[in-house]
Regions:
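Non-heme di-metal
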Residues: 2-244
């Protein structure tokens, strides 16, 4: 009898690891010391636009999973149980960001008033489509990327040292650096428990790669010294070859 192949989570980790170099570079560039304070303020506003969509996304995926469970979908029950727990864990993180924004010297309206950037809509909006018109299991790819590329453990001290900001302006970065590794382990354990078909595993992977691409474009945008976007073809290419 032949040995079992790599698990679903292992395949996803390998796939992301092969394609995440541009995101990691964009994140490193984003956190450089030069002009970090205004860039950090923009980062907080952008992350609020992302994070405030996450719990509603999971709530909608939970609703769909409950309906699918009634119809006998074998993924739906375990997926619904995971989403219930993760919704509780993520609730209120948008409020953390508003508090950080205020403590960093900006106004909550700086995050709440502007229309979120198209790249944020692309990141979250695709998930709504797949939840509604395909299967909520695709959302696991999105979660894997957001949890898997959380702030580094030493980032809080670097920001504080460079900007002089107080701890009250750094809660989101600090908490997510501590929490997201455990959250990612839970997600990958779920992936390995689910009776995924090859097609469903591919759905999760496509969602993850799209999320990786959108998150890369967001960090490239945030890492620019000026807020204005570069002309097309002037910036680095995204993992899918789309200019951010």
């Amino acid at each position: 009898m032949s040995a079992a192949g790599p698990s679903s989570s292992a395949r996803l980790r390998v796939t992301l690891g092969l394609l995440d170099a541009e995101l990691l570079h964009a994140m490193e560039h984003m956190w450089r010391e030069e002009d970090l304070l205004p860039r950090y303020r923009r980062y907080l506003c952008a992350m609020h636009a992302v994070v405030r969509a996450s719990v509603p996304l999971m709530e909608r995926a939970l609703e769909r999973s409950v309906r699918l469970d009634v119809c006998g979908d074998p993924l739906a029950g375990p997926l619904a149980a995971y989403l219930r727990g993760h919704i509780r864990e993520e609730a209120g993180h948008d409020v953390w960001l508003l508090e950080d924004i205020r403590a960093a010297g900006s106004l909550p309206a700086d995050a709440l008033a502007p229309m979120p950037a198209p790249v944020v809509a692309a990141l979250a909006g695709s998930q709504y489509y797949w939840i509604e018109h395909h299967h909520p299991v695709a959302l696991l790819g999105y979660i894997a990327v957001l949890e898997g590329y959380a702030p580094a453990a030493d980032l809080t001290s670097r920001i504080a040292r460079t900007t002089g900001l107080p701890d009250t302006a750094l809660r989101t970065v600090r908490e997510h650096a501590a929490l997201d590794t455990g959250h990612l382990d839970e997600l990958y354990a779920l992936l390995d428990r689910l009776p995924l078909t090859r097609g469903q595993e591919s759905d999760v992977t496509v969602s993850a790669l799209h999320s990786l691409d959108a998150l890369t474009r967001l960090f490239v945008r945030l890492g620019r010294s000026a807020a204005a976007p570069l002309p097309r073809r002037a910036g680095p290419l995204s993992p899918t070859g789309v200019t951010p």
